[in-house]
Design a protein with these regions (language model features):
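Glycine-rich phosphate/pyrophosphate-binding loop regions near the starts of catalytic domains
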Residues: 54-143, 147-175, 179-203
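Glycine-/charge-enriched secondary-structure boundary and capping motifs
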Residues: 141, 145-156, 233-237, 242-309
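Short Lys/Arg-rich basic patches
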Residues: 1-11, 17-20
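Short hydrophobic/aromatic beta-strand micro-patches
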Residues: 7, 181, 283-287
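Short, positively charged interaction helices/loops
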Residues: 18, 40-60
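Conserved mixed alpha/beta catalytic, RNA-binding, or beta-rich assembly cores of soluble enzyme
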Residues: 94, 107-109, 175-180, 190-233, ...
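Short, basic amphipathic alpha-helical segments that act as recognition/interaction helices
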Residues: 26-48
Length: 309
């Protein structure tokens, strides 16, 4: 048996001595048992307790696409989830087609990309912002909008946000892209959980362009908080943000993704084929008996738009 010398803080030594006295053991015996138990835990309990030693070869990583996200499944039991979005001709510049301030644009860039990643059950770790505009003032305004939106789900943008701007040439139209990288345990991914007889519900109404501004003010569109609320409910099975292809297209992908058919239901006044712009609608497949619970949870327009067959 080898002897190992280690330095420990006084507080830890006080705890060790207290335990030694309580159980009539020597200090070294307490340390030996503590280390033995810890090593046993690392060896046998869950992937999240193991130190991550990524000695991973590319051939060991499986790549899949799920809607607007890419998923890299690692042999460690973890999954890296990436989502991205882009915008052009929307912003405060001279030749932008939709005139909004930079903060508003940043908010919705963050909302779209974060929704896609969070909907899978992954936790966002990194946001990478690439801007085709100057840093000051437009870039700073867009960045501030992203930071505010990130804070709504508990992220610290000063730690997770990377930025790159175009400062070599003057720009007259706004262009921006945002990529979000998240991490999850593979067995906790919220993918392919939809079940036969599930209802497909739409939270929010599809809005695009200038419609989004008024709809946001009137509480008619889905937001990040709603996705987080859905993630916390066991009666919610799969979640998907709707983009430019519309509600019907996204709902069909949810059904086909689990090898099922979709019975489409078109509520009066809701266009299932209209673009939902910057993820103004979120779809969820739910236990049919919990529809009233969902409506009580989220005070937004909620419509049943389909049933999984």
């Amino acid at each position: 048996m080898d002897i190992i010398n280690v330095r420990l803080p006084d507080k830890v030594l006080e705890d060790v001595d207290r335990l030694a006295k309580k159980h009539s053991l020597t200090r070294s015996e307490v340390m030996r048992q503590a280390l033995t138990i810890y090593l046993h835990l690392i060896e046998n309990v869950g992937t999240m307790l193991r130190p991550i030693a990524f000695q991973v070869k590319p051939a060991q990583i499986s790549y899949t696409r799920h809607g607007d996200v890419s998923i890299l499944k690692m042999p460690t039991g973890h999954a890296i989830v990436t989502g991205s979005t882009s915008s052009g001709a929307v912003g405060p510049k001279e030749f932008d087609k939709v005139k909004v301030d930079g903060k508003f644009l940043g908010k919705f860039l963050a909302r779209v990309a974060l929704m896609d990643v969070i909907a899978t059950g992954a936790f966002p770790l990194l946001l990478s912002l690439t801007l085709g505009v100057e840093n000051d003032p437009t870039g700073k305004e867009i960045s501030e909008g992203i930071k505010r939106e990130a804070r709504t789900i508990g992220l610290d943008p000063n730690q997770v946000l990377m930025e790159n701007t175009e400062d070599n040439f003057p720009t007259v139209q706004t262009g921006a892209g945002l990529t979000v990288v998240g991490l999850a345990n593979e067995d906790e991914l919220r993918l392919g959980k939809t079940m036969p007889n599930d209802l497909v519900v739409a939270i929010g109404r599809p809005k695009v362009g200038m419609e989004v501004i008024a709809a946001e003010a009137h509480g008619e569109i889905a937001d990040l908080k709603n996705v987080a609320q859905l993630n916390q409910r066991k009666y919610v099975h799969d979640i998907a943000a709707v983009g430019s292809f519309g509600i019907a297209s996204e709902a069909k992908m949810m059904a086909y993704g689990v090898g099922r058919q979709l019975k489409l239901i078109e509520p009066k006044g809701l266009d299932l084929n209209k673009s939902a712009g910057p993820a103004t609608v979120v779809l969820a497949t739910i236990d049919p008996e919990r529809l009233d619970d969902l409506k009580a949870l989220i005070p937004k327009p909620i419509n049943v738009i389909g049933e999984i067959l």
